[in-house]
Amino acid sequence: SYFNFSNFKISTLNNQTTITANVNNTTKSDIPGFYFRIKALDESGNSIAEVEGLLDSVIKANSSSSIDIKASKDFANCYDIQIEKIKDID
């Protein structure tokens, strides 16, 4: 993959979840912004919540950007996460 997420932090307070992370471009080329989906998985690997996000700017080659998502979904029982790219920004 040409990008990865690091320094993932998930906090939940009063059914309000905040997700922050760095998005790292691991290539020698700029990559456009894109839509993505984060799924919270329980210990059995079942999806318990999901949220979609948008990285709305170009990430320069070998650099990173950050995301900050607030959602009214409860990720409190999250054991693992799954991230998938949905599509590039048109």
What are these regions (language model features)?
Residues 2-5, 50-52, 68-90:
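Terminal connector regions
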Residues 1-20:
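Low-complexity, acidic Ser/Thr/Pro/Gly-rich terminal tails and inter-domain linkers that flank the onset
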Residues 23-27:
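Asparagine-centered strand-capping/turn motif at beta-strand->loop junctions
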Residues 40-49:
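Short aromatic-acidic-glycine turn motif
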Residues 30-33, 48, 78:
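Short acidic/proline- and small/hydrophobic-mixed sequence motifs that coincide with surface turns
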Residues 56-64:
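Short proline/glycine- and polar residue-rich coil/turn motifs
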Residues 35-38, 53:
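Hydrophobic beta-strand segments
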